[in-house]
Amino acid sequence: MKIESVPETVPALEGKLDASGKRFAVVVSRFNSFITERLLLSACDGLIRTGAAKKDIDVVRVPGAFEVPAAARTLASTGKYDAIICIGCLLRGDTAHYDVIVNEVTRGIGQSAQETGVPHAFGVLTCDTLQQAIDRAGLKMGNKGFEAALAAVEMASLKATVGRQPSAVSKKQSLASSSVRHRNHKGARPRSSKKRR
């Protein structure tokens, strides 16, 4: 197998970490609040540091992580928000309950994002131990709430950027119509205003 040189890269669209002028909703689970409150504070800090105004951040509290997707979908469906940040903390127990909830929460958040078209950032911790959750809520492993906020800002920016880009189809149609106009103008004879008899 021959390895060839890497071809020139195609320009890529990327979102920017600029939350100014955008609205965000943060859905946070009250269950395991000693963890989720740390995630929430850090998520709001991330939004404000990237330019979001406090008045453009709405916080919605739900009983547990299982309720996060339904609330996120309700908020996304209003059309008021540029992105939704989903925050919760699930700790593995002795039964299969953890696996069921993790799967449903993950599926529900993803489905809400896909069906509404509003970016959703996943800030739900799924940990085996309490120590793992503590580490991810601001100690050894950073803060996943802050990371979710940055992801939400970038995806909201990317969505806005993509929305301003002409589609490939409209580019082709625009090129084709300008080509036709150019040919018609170039080869056309001036029409006489007099009628032939």
Which residues are covered by each model-predicted region?
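C-terminal binding/interaction regions
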Residues: 2-5, 22, 98-99, 103-197
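Generic structural signal for well-ordered, non-membrane alpha-helical segments
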Residues: 17, 32, 36, 40, ...
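Structural motif
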Residues: 25, 58, 82-84, 118-124
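Short, ordered loop/turn segments at secondary-structure junctions
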Residues: 30-31, 89-90, 125-129
